[in-house]
Amino acid sequence: MTADPPPPARHAARAGSFDAVAAQYAANRPSYPPALLDAVEELAGRPLSGAKAVDVGAGTGIASTLLHARGADVLAVEPGAGMAAEFRRALPHIPLVRGNGNALPLADATADLITYAQAWHWTDPARSVPEALRVLRPDGALALWWNTNALDVDWIAEAAGRAGRFLGIDIAAEQRKAGERVEQADPSGRLDFTRRTVRWSRRVPIGTHLANIATHSALLITPEERTAAFLEQERAHLLEVFPDGMVEETYDVLLIVARTP
């Protein structure tokens, strides 16, 4: 069956679950392809080089690293203590402030670009949209994106089915609902989002793939013994598909960008 949205306490538990695994998250989560940054520049109507970019929900700095490499002047905003500590350890050259998108600790009209990589769904758009508009300069842009599983790839669809049965959810339906939520990222209708999808893949050892899975919030709040058993079963399934121990992960990055009205 399809899971209902988590109640507030469960949502909060999932949102805060990453701090304890920040180093594992940084080491194993996928990054994003250069084509995504190209699309952000195109839809934002300006180059990243020289842009004042605020990366909200920056986590361990996966997106901040890419923005900085493109020449953006990046300020990271991260609510979690563990994630912020890992960010500062790995990226001491990029400033970070503690905070969240519902109440940005920033002055008005100070950013050319605000980004949320894999993070907008942890905010309340009734608060985070006005906050983004407050902080963005005229002609600024808000860019939101998510790595999503390419469920048209057979082995990925099969793995999603197994994970869904373990967690008691329909992952394919949840991913479709996520797409709908992206289209409704601003319930107030103040922003006009343009949508783009970028497909990419990476080839990683099975251990990296499993460690990545283990950093997802639904598993992080599952009892450790159950999660460990599930991951061992997954290892066996994956070795049947990838006998050399190298997994070809395929992602569709779902990107939406809106310029300030």
Where in this protein do the model-derived segments appear?
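Conserved class I S-adenosyl-L-methionine
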Residues: 1-49, 83
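A structural alpha-helix within SAM-dependent methyltransferase catalytic domains
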Residues: 41, 65-68, 129, 133
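Nucleotide donor/acceptor-binding cores
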Residues: 50-51, 109
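Class I SAM-dependent methyltransferase SAM/SAH-binding core
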Residues: 52-54, 59-103
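A short acidic, Gly/Pro-enriched loop at the edge of an enzyme's catalytic core
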Residues: 102-114
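A short SAM/SAH-binding and catalytic strip from SAM-dependent methyltransferases
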Residues: 112-126
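Conserved catalytic/acceptor-binding region of the Class I
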Residues: 127-203
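Conserved Class I S-adenosyl-L-methionine
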Residues: 180-261
